Amino acid sequence: MGIQISLPMMAFLVFMTGFAGFVDSAAGGGGLISLPAYLFAGLPPHYTYATNKFSAACGTTFATASFFKNGAMNLKVGILAAIGSFAGSALGAHIVLMLSDEVLQMMMFIILPIAAVVILWRRNLPDENRDDGTLNLKKALLALGIGLGIGLYDGMVGPGTGTFAIIAFTSLMGFDLRTANGNGKVLNLASNYASLFTYLSSGLVVFPVGIPCAISNIVGNIIGSHFALTKGAKFIRPMMLVVLVLLLGKLVTDML
C-alpha cells in the first residue's frame, strides 16, 4: 500500500513515538500516545496497529535489556508470563486481522473506558515487595495466566498493556513497582513480537514510517528506563497517573 506522509508529519510522528517510548518504559501505556499519532498521520487502522507494533517492539527490546542488566525483574516469573503473553498476543493479532476498520474502532471505544476504570481503581499501588522469592506451581500458573490475559489484550487493543502488567504483578503476585515493571517488560516484549510476526506475515508494517519511529522509540525507552530504575516508585507512580490522564483524554476525544 502506497502511504505518503509529509516531512512535517513525519517529524511529528518521530517526536510522538519517542515520547511514547519514554512513557512506556517508565509506566507502560505508550500506545496511548503512539496509536493516535499514527492514525492522525493518516495510516489506516490495520497499518497503524502493525507499524506501531514494529516501533514498540524495537523500543521495548532496549528497555527490557536495561531492566535485566540492573536486576530489576524476577526472570523466572517474567519468562513464564512471556510464554503466556506470546500465545495470547498471537491469537489477538490474528483476531484483529479478521476484523474491519470500523469494528476495530468500535472495539477501542468499548474497551478503553473499561481500561480507564481499572487503572483509576488501582492507581495507588503498594510498593513493598511481598514476594518470598520462591516459585511454586500456583505462582507459575498465575504468571502464565497474567501473561495470557494481558497478551490477548495487547494483541487485540494494546494501550495500557504495561500499566496493566504492573497492576497485575503488584496486586496479584506481591512484587514492588520496580520489579513489577521489569516483569512487565519481559511480558510486553514477548507480546509485541508475537503480534509483530503476525503483522509482518501480512505485509502490514509500513517500514519507511516505522524505521525512523522505531529509532525514536528506542531513544525514548532508554531514557525512560533510566529514570524508572534510578527514581523507582517516586517516578513510576506519577507516570502511571499521566498515563491515566492520557487514556481519559483519548476517551473524551473519541466521544466528540
Regions found by a protein language model. Give the residues of each.
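Hydrophobic alpha-helical transmembrane segments in multi-pass integral membrane proteins
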Residues: 147-157, 195-203, 210, 247-256
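Residues within membrane-spanning alpha-helices of integral membrane proteins
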Residues: 10, 53, 108-112, 116, ...
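Residue-level signature of the transmembrane alpha-helical core
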Residues: 14, 18, 22, 53, ...
